[in-house]
Amino acid sequence: MNDAIPRPQAKTRKALTPLLEIRNLTKSYDGQHAVDDVSLTIYKGEIFALLGASGCGKSTLLRMLAGFEQPSAGQIMLDGVDLSQVPPYLRPINMMFQSYALFPHMTVEQNIAFGLKQDKLPKAEIASRVNEMLGLVHMQEFAKRKPHQLSGGQRQRVALARSLAKRPKLLLLDEPMGALDKKLRDRMQLEVVDILERVGVTCVMVTHDQEEAMTMAGRIAIMNRGKFVQIGEPEEIYEHPTTRYSAEFIGSVNVFEGVLKERQEDGLVLDSPGLVHPLKVDADASVVDNVPVHVALRPEKIMLCEEPPANGCNFAVGEVIHIAYLGDLSVYHVRLKSGQMISAQLQNAHRHRKGLPTWGDEVRLCWEVDSCVVLTV
């Protein structure tokens, strides 16, 4: 498993300090593993995303971190302390739920102050922290309003302020943008990241939204059937997936099957049933004789070519079956001679670009050798 060091801002690997260590954590229900022997290290100040489809185990893992579920096996270490058997109210951890769970009868400032009052902090300290949080989330002028008088984005900021007011060592976010519309969600993702980075709190978030994870997190763990499929930075997971599952879960991808045909100095040549012409991949790809592999190719790596490439590029010929115009780009769905469907993306850089293929046209698709990622699992 690639437990890669995160991409820190103005930090070196030496400066990173582990905060949360998950050691062989398992949670079983009736003999079925919801979380299956996972291990992970998260560093101070890191924003980390657990990403996966419904039922993959990500929410169960988050609930174990919060203390709402007891592990069947394994340890949860926070700053060197084993929290596995510590009740939720004694953990230096706060959780922000998708529904925000604001008290409807309380004002904004009363909601933010609630946890501080439960901890019996002095009134002056409570007032100081509430004012600090109101300023942090830019909600000073809404301090006297109640939740029903706020927009969705404002309610989210209040919930975040309440979670940060107690100055937790670890903040947990459960589908933080799930209740927002797309435009507001896109804006709030950047706003929340900015707030978390200014505070410096370590954060673990759960989401099924790949764009949300890639926008907000420094590292991502893709989960499937209770296990980590791949851990890494967003760019690493997208450009260098280690399994077919992670390649298909993040973004769009074309997948070809192939078997090694020939080893050349500048690359490996594969026979692929989906392609008329041999498929060439990097020479250092992990390919064994007579063992089938999958080759992943992102749609944006494919070019439309008028003539066969002369520089050793891969190419295929097919018929345009459908075109999806998405504003900034168009997606061409092409049926190859073999019958396999692949998609190619073309940026709409010019408002009125002539000569582009349309439905029913025969097109030639080209892609570089290093655009192919060979997957053995």
From Swiss-Prot:
Single GO MF annotation: ATP hydrolysis activity
Pfam entry (one): ABC_tran
Keyword Membrane attributed: yes
Membrane topology recorded in Swiss-Prot or TrEMBL: Peripheral membrane protein
PROSITE patterns: ABC_TRANSPORTER_1, ABC_TRANSPORTER_2
EC number: 7.6.2.16
Top-level taxonomic group: Bacteria
Residues noted as binding ATP in the record, renumbered to the chain: G52, A53, S54, G55, C56, G57, K58, S59
GO annotation, cellular component aspect: ATP-binding cassette (ABC) transporter complex; ATP-binding cassette (ABC) transporter complex, substrate-binding subunit-containing; membrane
Chief location of this protein within or outside the cell: membrane
Keyword Membrane: yes
Compartments reported by the entry: Cell inner membrane
Activity regulation comment: Transport is feedback inhibited by intracellular polyamines.
Catalytic activity: putrescine(out) + ATP + H2O = putrescine(in) + ADP + phosphate + H(+)
Occurrences of domain ABC transporter (ranges): 20-250
GO biological process: putrescine transport
Family per record: Belongs to the ABC transporter superfamily.
Protein task: Part of the ABC transporter complex PotFGHI involved in putrescine uptake. Responsible for energy coupling to the transport system. Imports putrescine for maintenance of the optimal concentration of polyamines necessary for cell growth in the presence of glucose.
Assembly, per entry: The complex is composed of two ATP-binding proteins (PotG), two transmembrane proteins (PotH and PotI) and a solute-binding protein (PotF).
Listed name of the protein: Putrescine transport ATP-binding protein PotG
Species: Escherichia coli (strain K12)
